[in-house]
Amino acid sequence: LSREQLTSARASGVGSVVMFGATTGRDGIGGASVLASQELGEDDADKRPSVQVGDPFTGKKLIEVSVELIESNLVESLQDCGAAGLASALSEMAASFGLDIHLDRVPLRQTDLEPWEIMISESQERMVAAVTPSLVPAVKEICARWELPCTEIGTVTDSGVLRCFWNGEVIGDIPARFLTEEAPRYQLELAPRSKQDPPPAPVGPAFRQALLELLASDNIRDRSWVFERYDYVVGSRTVRRPGLDAGVLRLRPSLRGLALSLDGNGRIAWLDPRIGGAHAVLEAARNVACSGGEPLAITNCLNFGNPEKPEMAWELSEAIEGMAQACEALGIPVVSGNVSLYNETDGQPIYPTPVVGCVGLVPDVRTIGSAWREGDVVLLAGAARLSIAGSEYQALYDKVGGAPEEFELEAEAALIRFLWKNNHLFSIAHDVAEGGLAVCLAECAIFSGVGAHLDIPTDPVQLFGECGGLAVVACAREQVSKLEADGVPLREIGTAGGDSLNGLPLADLTRAWQAKEASSEEI
């Protein structure tokens, strides 16, 4: 899609409002809007909404229709029906003008829906568009060709009011701007949580046992039992499968690719939500860069406890600030996002967990490396102040506590640039994340099927500490001089080769990493 074809969600003038896609049912009524705005307990079964029923085939047709309508210049604005359904979509569309909407014209899956149910239903695969009246027949013709229902449900007006009709009678009206720019804002009380006392350094087992146990831990072990349940090569565009940093899809007909990653660490955010928010953004961007992509944008899901409690509100505010600082340092926008609040059980909140998805552009998918080769030079890129606080090592062998190290955002941005700019020279690039340097190196060996002889520290903090700012890269000896470090520290730590990692058999590492497969009850 070219920049010129980007379509606003807001109406830009008087015209018709059409709705196309799936029919509207009771599935998801009050879904995301309820779950994100109140606590639910054992006595609230009546508040638990029915789950939205997704239909990937209809979703694919909806995408194709939307693209064709945009390319044909048939729509003035376009908006999907997400959380809060039509109530949200129409509010955003009406913000600068007004809308008259006839809810009795909305195609229904169940004929006995009441008007308020139609407004807040979160049935999937539905779009609304503002269309010049003379172009409505052309819009309907395209929808019919794709076998998607399309109905004119109202008009864009210049009244500045969103009005809802039922069988010709006005049943609700409200100034449109009151639902958007002039909506009441929460004024939440913020109370910083007391700092965690740093616990003594955990006393873990010897290096070999610690590494094997970390590889088998829930947050690090092989994830293929999850993604192999889905067709991750559908469309035959998958260049790099899930499992190593970011997945990559080819953007046909060119050789460019789209790298996608998803990251979050609730333990880090619990110890320091500002650092945790930045951590999620930076790790997602590093993963994209390790896969050859220049990070372009992020989306997010903010998973927190009850924001009406001052400490929880402070966690949310701090995490958002950390994410904003990281995005500014990287020069990337937040293009979408959602929240999941009030996540508590018997008054105990979940870890504050900002989750970030990042997308990046790969110039040439043919150059992406996924395995080091015999004789490759192994380098450590970056310089970070590592910490055991909030690490997988600490969680495995002790109580989580202490303070994670602050990020040096300029250094992080420089490392990410180094990773994607030089990726065509790497046989593999992998960021140091959960499990620290030791796990990063073990994963490189496992993915490559080749061991390595490395000069690595023996201190547990240097081996298993976390907090970003580091990546392992490998390349042929003759390529080292071609690397454009641009101020990023580079240190040669060894050579790939053999069937062990510093004497630890590759077969043992792989066996530990693949040993635990979740039962159906865990999924």
Residue ranges of each PLM-predicted region?
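Non-catalytic terminal/interface segments that mediate subunit docking, oligomerization
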Residues: 7-10, 30-31, 190-339, 343-438, ...
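Hydrophobic/aromatic beta-strand patches that form the interior of the parallel beta-sheet core
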Residues: 18, 260, 379, 491-494
